[in-house]
């Protein structure tokens, strides 16, 4: 087996499809994926590629490259159970911050694999568009440039993959944009207008960069595909789960109802709380994340947005 993809959700299936154009791919998931994989495999076979096969966890461990697409909140437990070789070549495609330990993805992973064997996938993309073969540009961040290029060379013809360093900047950008995307959904749901939305996203990008710079993230990362690119996509599209959370909150629905109706994981909800606690610990100014955290805890949506526009 060349590439093992862990995670049977929409994102995991999309990545399995993407890597399946050029490579033998197996997907590992607890759920039955026979029906979801049928259309994807039909498309791969029509291109002359091998179909994706679902396998169990034990068989999935014997691969050249590993792609991880599971919720960040379960990532530590997953690593504990998977028992990957310490030198396994891993690409993490999960965007968020672990709430329990206030840990970034790379901090979780370093307890289980060699940091030089780790890559992080960032940039603007939606699973629904990838499975249609629509073009996009992504970034593979790693301290190991050769490994980043190895993963980049495995991507399909419709994805332009850049290899860059600054793994901390890439993962913070990927996590933080989900937070701003919720606020973007609220802004649109309240019909506050294009000017307010532009102000929100611009200040959101500044806030993201400020937070990331504290931990060593590079400015160019936040101004590129991993930061600005992913932010502008996620905060403006109904295809974004986090954006849809914001739309629901704008209708004065309780968060529990919004998440139940969503039926999928929106990483930005828990990431918001993690960011606020980290920012409080280190004295980082995060007005948008801080106000959004109050909104998620039940503050009036109109009051939150009014306060946010004045503060951000």
Swiss-Prot record:
One of the GO biological process terms: glycerol-3-phosphate catabolic process
Residues annotated as binding sn-glycerol 3-phosphate: 95, 123, 125, 177, 230, 240-242
Transmembrane parts of this sequence: none
Pathway(s): Membrane lipid metabolism; glycerophospholipid metabolism
Source taxon at top rank: Bacteria
Cellular component annotations (GO), alphabetically ordered: cytosol
Keyword Cell cycle: no
Enzyme Commission number, as recorded: 1.1.1.94
Membrane keyword on record: no
Localization in the cell: Cytoplasm
Keywords carried by this UniProt record: Cytoplasm, Lipid biosynthesis, Lipid metabolism, NAD, NADP, Nucleotide-binding, Oxidoreductase, Phospholipid biosynthesis, Phospholipid metabolism
Residues involved in NADPH binding: 11, 30-31, 95, 127, 241, 265, 267
Active site residues per record: 177
Molecular function GO terms recorded: glycerol-3-phosphate dehydrogenase [NAD(P)+] activity; NAD binding
InterPro entries in alphabetical order: 6-PGluconate_DH-like_C_sf, 6PGD_dom2, G3P_DH_NAD-dep, G3P_DH_NAD-dep_C, G3P_DH_NAD-dep_N, NAD(P)-bd_dom_sf
Pfam families on file: NAD_Gly3P_dh_C, NAD_Gly3P_dh_N
Catalytic activity: sn-glycerol 3-phosphate + NAD(+) = dihydroxyacetone phosphate + NADH + H(+); sn-glycerol 3-phosphate + NADP(+) = dihydroxyacetone phosphate + NADPH + H(+)
Family: Belongs to the NAD-dependent glycerol-3-phosphate dehydrogenase family.
Role noted for this protein: Catalyzes the reduction of the glycolytic intermediate dihydroxyacetone phosphate (DHAP) to sn-glycerol 3-phosphate (G3P), the key precursor for phospholipid synthesis.
PANTHER family per record: GLYCEROL-3-PHOSPHATE DEHYDROGENASE, GLYCEROL-3-PHOSPHATE DEHYDROGENASE [NAD(+)] 2, CHLOROPLASTIC
Record HAMAP family: NAD_Glyc3P_dehydrog (MF_00394)
NCBIfam families in the cross-refs: PRK00094.1-2 (NF000940), PRK00094.1-4 (NF000942), PRK00094.2-1 (NF000943)
Protein name per its UniProtKB record: Glycerol-3-phosphate dehydrogenase [NAD(P)+]
Organism: Helicobacter pylori (strain ATCC 700392 / 26695) (Campylobacter pylori)
The gene coding this protein: gpsA
């Amino acid at each position: 087996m060349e590439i093992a993809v862990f995670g049977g959700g929409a994102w995991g299936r999309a990545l399995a499809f993407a890597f399946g154009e050029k490579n033998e791919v197996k997907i590992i998931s607890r759920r039955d994926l026979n029906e979801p994989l049928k259309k994807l495999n039909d498309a791969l076979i029509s291109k002359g590629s091998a179909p994706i096969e679902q396998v169990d966890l034990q068989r999935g461990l014997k691969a050249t490259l590993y792609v991880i697409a599971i919720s960040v909140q379960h990532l530590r437990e997953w690593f504990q159970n998977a028992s990957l070789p310490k030198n396994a070549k891993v690409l993490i495609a999960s965007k968020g911050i672990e709430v329990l330990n206030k840990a970034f993805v790379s901090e979780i992973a370093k307890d289980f694999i060699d940091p030089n064997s780790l890559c992080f996938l960032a940039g603007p993309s939606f699973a629904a568009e990838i499975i249609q073969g629509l073009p996009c540009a992504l970034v593979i961040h790693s301290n190991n440039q050769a490994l980043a290029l190895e993963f980049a060379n495995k991507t399909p013809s419709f994805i332009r993959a850049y290899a860059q360093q600054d793994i901390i900047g890439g993962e913070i950008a990927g996590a933080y944009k989900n937070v701003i995307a919720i606020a973007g959904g609220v802004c649109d749901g309240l019909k506050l207008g294009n000017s307010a939305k532009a102000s929100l996203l611009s200040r959101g990008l500044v806030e993201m960069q400020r937070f990331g710079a504290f931990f060593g993230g590079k400015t160019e990362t936040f101004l590129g595909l991993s930061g600005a690119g992913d932010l502008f996509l996620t905060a403006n599209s109904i295809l974004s789960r986090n954006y849809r959370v914001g739309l629901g909150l704008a209708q004065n629905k309780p968060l529990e109802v919004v998440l139940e109706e969503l039926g999928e994981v929106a990483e930005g909800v828990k990431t918001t709380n993690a960011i606020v606690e980290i920012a409080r610990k280190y004295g980082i100014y995060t007005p948008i994340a801080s106000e959004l955290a109050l909104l998620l805890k039940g503050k009036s949506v109109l009051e939150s947005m009014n306060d946010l526009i004045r503060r951000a």
